[in-house]
Amino acid sequence: MIAILGLAAAAPSAQGQGYNPFQIGASGGIAFPTGDLGTGTNTGYNIAVVVGYKPQLLPISVRAEAAYNQFGRTGGGSSVNIPSFTGNVVYELPLGMSFTPYAIGGAGLYRPSVGFNSGGATSAENDFGWNIGGGIKIPLSTSFETFVEARYNSVSVSGPNGGTASFIPVTVGILF
């Protein structure tokens, strides 16, 4: 009896063998300025590093991201730079298909600034921001997946100009 209990406790489930709930990845894509930010800036780009935790058999996971967005100013001479550090919750919609749609949303620290090509002074302040969006995840193996997503980001900008900086990055990424 003790031997049977020992074997039962030592034998991992076939479904759980080799599963690692921790993920790391990267993404990049195009970023569209909207609202106040869309006035006077051009379409830009987004790059990000992702660290996540995805419990097995649950449709909810968490993702921490360090991202960088840059938008050129119309007329040249400067750019708007928005690095961010956010925590996000991902909810997968398990539909039993070869891809999985998901909703994502979170909040964190954004640091918008304007950089001048002539080397002029820049100003940057830490501001609160949030994001919400969705995507499609495509598993390529048990430990490797790719995704395509779009998220609306809104940053409450402090300082003399104030207002809200909003943008929508459309990205492609990989997770290991």
Regions found by a protein language model. Give the residues of each.
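Cleavable N-terminal export/targeting peptides
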Residues: 1-20
